[in-house]
Structures are given as structure tokens and as C-alpha cells.
Amino acid sequence: MEHKPTHTSGQCPVMHGGATSSNSSNVAWWPKALNLDILHQHDRKSNPMGADFSYREELKKLDVEALKRDLKTLMTDSQDWWPADWGHYGGLMIRMAWHSAGSYRVGDGRGGADTGNQRFAPLNSWPDNANLDKARRLLWPIKQKYGNKISWADLMILAGNMAYESMGLKTFGFAFGREDIWHPEKDIYWGAEQEWLAPSGAENSRYSGERDLENPLAAVMMGLIYVNPEGVDGNPDPLKTAKDMRVTFARMGMNDEETVALTAGGHTVGKAHGNGNAANLGADPESADLEEQGLGWNNHKSRGIGRDTVTSGIEGAWTTNPTQWDNGFFHLLFSYDWWLQKSPAGAWQWEPVNIKEEDKPVDVEDPTIRHNPIMTDADMALKLDPEYRKISERFHKDPAYFSETFARAWFKLTHRDMGPKARYFGPDVPAETLIWQDPVPTGRKDYDVDAVKAKIIASGLSIGEMVSTAWDSARTFRNSDKRGGANGARIRLAPQKDWLGNEPEKLAKVLNVLEAIASEFNISVADTIVLAGNVGVEQAAKAAGIAITVPFAAGRGDATIEQTDVESFDVLEPIADGFRNWQKQHYAVNPEELLLDRAQLLGLSAPEMTVLIGGLRVLGTNHGGTKHGVFTDNVGALSNDFFVNLTDMRYTWKPTGRNSYDIVERNSGNVKWTATRVDLVFGSNSILRAYAEVYAQDDNKEKFVKDFVAAWTKVMNADRFDI
């Protein structure tokens, strides 16, 4: 028999691509299969720090003042490999911080500066983030020096703060507490376009109708942080750009005044770079060759640094003194007429007509040379849009008000995704509490929990009512920006009390009972709601023959309507909740994908999601009391019946509508139960079925209850950063 060699000289003896690229992955073979990867992120396997590492404990060792001094020294320590404009890195560091925080969007709370994700794809290679890799490399000696005591996420934002302070701005404050991730996020949807900077008419565009931007996106193009500086789709028209700005900044959580302040304040210092040919730039960091060592956009064909740098393609500074915080932006904007010109790199920009020589900024390398300042289309929108102009004129006339408004808006921009003040750390945390931080008063902890539980048991509320109300209160939590959750009991306030997903009539009835109990014991309604849910779970476990105590952490407070920005809470309204087998309407996205998104925002793993579904189904918590997925004859008992019957081959499953199925007995043909896609995916998807089979086993009835209680408690305490 002829034997073939295992490999021949010159051939690689490993399997090409299968383990190291996505070309042969399961997703590539079965693109429509439910991808659970978003629930399997940022675990210990990808984290180089040990399980006992605590960033908060490391922060306690940080010499904050020494770090701030080092950062301010860095600003004027120009390096030959990437020289500082006018000898000051402030503009570069501010852009890095701005773009780290500016990817945040309120729609789903994803993006932002809280994780240091600018270090990874796709953000590290976005066109709008060109040359920010240089800023991070300039910071590396400081990160190396302070090590574990400062995260990249904190350092990038603090560098922006110190840049502003070194140029004369009094900042509003700074909070440490952002923790680094160690690989790119898999859960953030950046858009469906397949090319960078695709115009709005391109295939898979994020726009529909007149110019309706797809939710939850905020940026106008794939690869931009906010709007196109040259104009809508690269066509200058400040009034059209103003419309884009309103949508984009609103989706970042900013109003008109904050939008004007951030735009003008961001352009008060630094410059744009476009003095050269963009075609000379090399690949972005993710695509660059090994010898580039993670640096991108390197120019090996011409000088490409200093005055010859190309980044956005726009060329010039906005103000006369680009390394000094002042009111020069508005002075130039209102002092001159502006006309469209092309930069040396071919980008559209606005330049002043007949500007005085002394109003021109000097060259970044030679102070004897002066250049025209520039404005982007977004800058011109601040002058030409009527509402933006009113705000701009006030800032122009009152520089102190502009500085204060910008400082507050900058703090909001850079801290919005950190969540409540309980997560803030450090000596520069502002004493003032701001409404966008969703403040919650501290609640009582010293009370007789067992006495309250006894009162709840005697209240006449059903297991389903108690459990579903607690779930609805807690499910608003978003691990993305740490908003929502049971603390504060905002489920009793507008807008949450009126959300369709919360069944307002039933909710009002339950709250009426629980608020009376809370008042009797002088405790928070928030604690009482969660405690009632725990009581329901304990009673259900007892009905299934298992005695268990659900852990409870007292101390939640009750927020007031004055502490609640009603409009900002609208974005937390659920459009679907697979855990309660409900969705507001049919969507292009399948129900099981919406379930996955909610589970990820709640911080759940796939096994936790699975056990919660199985438990909530048998507890009678379905929205509107529907029977879909209630695969049990003993509703109210915390049994594993959902999994037992889902995996039972005595049944077949027949579709009856877009999102409805009959569970039919094979022998008789009788309909036994009904279900939705969310129910049946736990028997269809191979991974979820593997989990379902674990909980369907005869020897895992107690494990099912224990795991359900653990996952339930995790959700109830998801927003308890104080414990």
C-alpha cells in the first residue's frame, strides 16, 4: 500500500485558517444560526489579571497628583517620531479622549470610554480614529510606570482632562473606576455597511426614509464618531449638517447647548491634519504589517509628520491660539465671513475671507509662518442654524459661561457610561449630584427582613404577580452603561409605570399592596419589590419540594420624580422581553435574538439565561398571562418541567403563525401546549439544547432550583454597586 507523506518540504503542517480565521467557522457555514458569543465575553481566559485582582484596590495605591503631573509634563515633551503641534500634545490627547467617550449611544448604552475599547478593533482602526494610536503610544511610558494602578480606560480620559487643564481650562472633575477589557466587544452593533465611510445611499445603509438613522446608532457613517466634518455624505451644507448633529448628539445624550459647547470646546484647541496626500498613508493598525507593531496610517512615501501630517484630510487650526483655552473659536466664527475651500489633501473646509494677519494661527513648526484658520461644516452649523446660533452668541458674549458649560458637558461626555456615582473613585469626584447620573437615595438596611417577608406572604399577592413585578423592576438594568435596575424603584414613576411591557394595570395593583407594606415598616419600595420577588421564588421552590432561601441585600432607596430625567429613561423601555415571553410587535429581528440582547445587557451567561427562562415559564410570569411556553401542569412550582417537556420526544412542534407553535402529542395528535420562538430555541439551538438537557435530567432538579436562585439574585443585585 502506498503511503503519502504527512507533509512535504515547504508546506505548513497545520490546518490552515480553521482555528485562526473566521472563513471556516460555524458562523460562516451557518450564518443564520443563533450566535451566543455575545454572552461569552471578557472572562478569565482572556484576562491576564488573576481572579483576585481588584482594580479598585489598586486605585487606592495610586499617587493621583504625581500621575497628573506626569501627564501635564507629557503634553510638552515632544518626541521626534511623532512631534507635537506647536510643542503641545493637548489637541491630540483631547481627540483621543473625545473619541474614546464619543462612541457612546444612549439607545443601548453601548460604546463609550468605560472599557478602554479604543485599543481594539474596530475602533483602533476606524478612519475617524486615525493616528490616535500615536496618542496611546505616547501614553505608554506613563501606563508602564503606574502599571495596575491605572487602567487604559481611565488613563485615556484623564489625559484629555489634563490636556485641557494644561491649556487653561478649569475642568469640572474626574472619576476613576473604568476597568479595561482585553479583547474586542462582540455585542456592539456598529452598522451593517460593508465599507468604511459608506454614504447614506450605499448598500446596507443605516438610513431609511427621508433621513431616518437606524437605532441604536448615533454616528452618521461607518467609521465616524459623530458627523461628517465635510458635510452630509461629504457635501458641504451647514444646515443639513445641523440636522445630523441634532440626531447624533441627542443619541449621545446631549441637548443643543451641550452640543454647541462640545463642538466649540473640542475645536478651541488643536488642529486638523490634511497637509499631504492621503494616498501615501499605510494600512490601519489592524491591517498593518507585523513590523509596524500595531501602528497604522504610517507614511513611508513622504515626511508625514509635523506640518505634513495627514489624518482627517482637513488642514488647519480653528483658533489663533490652538494651545490655549480661550474664546477664540467664537471670535473667529463671528468676526469673519467664511467660504468653501479644498485642503491640500482634497477635503472640503471653510476658510475666512480677508482675515487679519494677526488672527491667523502660526505654523506648527515655524512661528514666522501663519496660515488661515479653518471651520468644518459642523462648526459652520453653529453659526447658521438659528437655534445653535443663539447658543453660540451667548457663549461668544459670556466666555465664563461657555467655559463652565463646556466643562460640565465634557464631564458628562466622559462619564456618562460609568453609571451611578457609587462607581466613581478618586479625589476629584465632584460633590454635586447630576440628574443624568440617575441618583438614588440610600435606603435603610437595619430592619427585620423576616417580618417584612411574613407581611408579604399574607398580602394575597400571587407568586406570578410578585415575581413578574420584581423582574420588571430589575430587568431595565444595562451592564453597558450601568443604567436601570431595581434600585430606586423607578418602576413606580413615569415613564416606567406606564410602559406596556410592565402591564400598567396589574403593576398598579401590586404596587398598591407593596407600597403599603413599605410604609408600614419604613423601608424603601425598591427593597420591598425585590423582597416580594424573592418570597415568590421561595414559595415556588417549596411547592416543588425544595426548601431554599433567596439571598437578599437590603439598602435600596426610592428615587423621586425630581431625581428622574423622564425623557432619558424612555430609551430603557423594553420593546421585547423573552424572559416574560412578550414583544411589543413583530420586528425584523427574531425574538430569540432580542432575548439574547437583553440577556447580554443584564450581564447573563448562556446557562444563566437558560435557567431563568425555564424557571420564569413555570412561575406564571408570562406577560398578559399567556400560556406560551408554560410546559407544566403545576404552575407556581419551581420545577424543571419546562426542560423535561421541551426535550421529550413524545411531542412534535408545529408552526401556527410567525411566532407561535403548537406542541402536539405524537400518538394522539392533540395539542398539549403552545410556544414561541423564544421557547423552542432552547430545544433547537445545539448549545442551548445542551444546557436544557442538563436541567431536564432527573438528578438535577435541585441543581435547577439552586442555579435559578443564583441567576435571579444576580439580576436583582445587578445595579447594587454599593455591595
UniProtKB/Swiss-Prot annotation:
Residues under site feature: Transition state stabilizer: 95
Residue(s) of cross-link: Tryptophyl-tyrosyl-methioninium (Trp-Tyr) (with M-252): 98-226
Crosslink feature (Tryptophyl-tyrosyl-methioninium (Tyr-Met) (with W-98)) location: 226-252
Binding positions for heme b per the UniProt entry: 267
Catalytic activity, as annotated: H2O2 + AH2 = A + 2 H2O; 2 H2O2 = O2 + 2 H2O
EC number: 1.11.1.21
CDD domains attached to this UniProt entry: catalase_peroxidase_1, catalase_peroxidase_2
Lineage: Bacteria, Pseudomonadati, Pseudomonadota, Gammaproteobacteria, Vibrionales
InterPro entries to which the protein is assigned, alphabetical: Catalase_peroxidase, Haem_peroxidase, Haem_peroxidase_sf, Peroxidases_AS
Family, per entry: Belongs to the peroxidase family. Peroxidase/catalase subfamily.
Protein name, as recorded: Catalase-peroxidase
UniProt KW Metal-binding keyword: yes
Record's comment on post-translational modification: Formation of the three residue Trp-Tyr-Met cross-link is important for the catalase, but not the peroxidase activity of the enzyme.
UniProt function note: Bifunctional enzyme with both catalase and broad-spectrum peroxidase activity.
Any one GO biological process: hydrogen peroxide catabolic process
Catalytic residues of the enzyme: 99
Cofactor mode of binding and number, as noted: Binds 1 heme b (iron(II)-protoporphyrin IX) group per dimer.
Pfam families: peroxidase
Cofactor(s) recorded in Swiss-Prot or TrEMBL: heme b
GO CC, any one term: cytosol
Subunit field text: Homodimer or homotetramer.
Alphabetical keyword list: Heme, Hydrogen peroxide, Iron, Metal-binding, Oxidoreductase, Peroxidase
Gene Ontology MF terms in the entry: catalase activity; heme binding; metal ion binding
